[in-house]
Amino acid sequence: LAIEAGMPPGVLNVVNGDKEAVDTLLESKDVQAISFVGSTPIAEYVYHTGTKNNKRVQALGGAKNHMVIMPDADVNKTTDAIIGSAFGSAGERCMAISVAVCVGKKTKEKIKTKLLEETAKLNVGPYTDEKSDFGPLNNKAHFEKVLGYIDTGEKEGAKLLSDGRNFKKQGYENGYFVGPTIFDDVKPE
C-alpha cells in the first residue's frame, strides 16, 4: 500500500523478529528511525538502545488495539478487518486488533457467527506457501507464551470458541503454528 501511495520501495519496512533481529536494526548505520508498538519493557529497550545509536525512535508501550462494532456495521467488512488484523503476520503486528467490543447482543451474535465461519477457512502454513493466510510464530519461546495466554484465558473463565493450540501442519509438525483462536465473554480484569 505504501508503494501504491507513492512511497519509494525500501523506505518503509515491517520486520518481525527476535532480539537479535531487533538489535541488528537498532545498531545499523543504515537505519535512521524506528517505530515500535508492543510491551512496555520492550518499548523502553527499543527507545534507549535506538537513541543511544542516534536514531529517531517512536516507542509505544503497553499498547492494545480495540474495535468497537456498532449495530449497523457491515458484517462482512467488519469480520474481514478483524481477521486481517488479528491473523495477518501470525498476529505479530503492532496494529493487531486484540479486542472486539460489539454493541448489542444481536451484533455480537452476527459477528461471532461470521468470524467463526471465516476463520475456519483460513489456511495456516509456512510463509513460503502462497496459499497460506498466516504463518507460524517466530520462535519457540513466543509460541509457548501464546499457548500460555490461551491457557490463562480459559483458567480465568473466558469461553474458548476456537482453540488453535493443537494445530499441526502436515510436513511442518515441529513448526510454531497456532491455529485461529477466538475467545468470548472475556472478563476485563
Model region roles, listed by residue range:
Residues K29, A33, T40-P188:
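ALDH superfamily catalytic-core signature
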Residues L1-V22:
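PLP-dependent aminotransferase-like
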Residues N16-T24, G38-Y45:
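Beta-loop-alpha module in the N-terminal Rossmann-like domain of NAD(P)-dependent dehydrogenases
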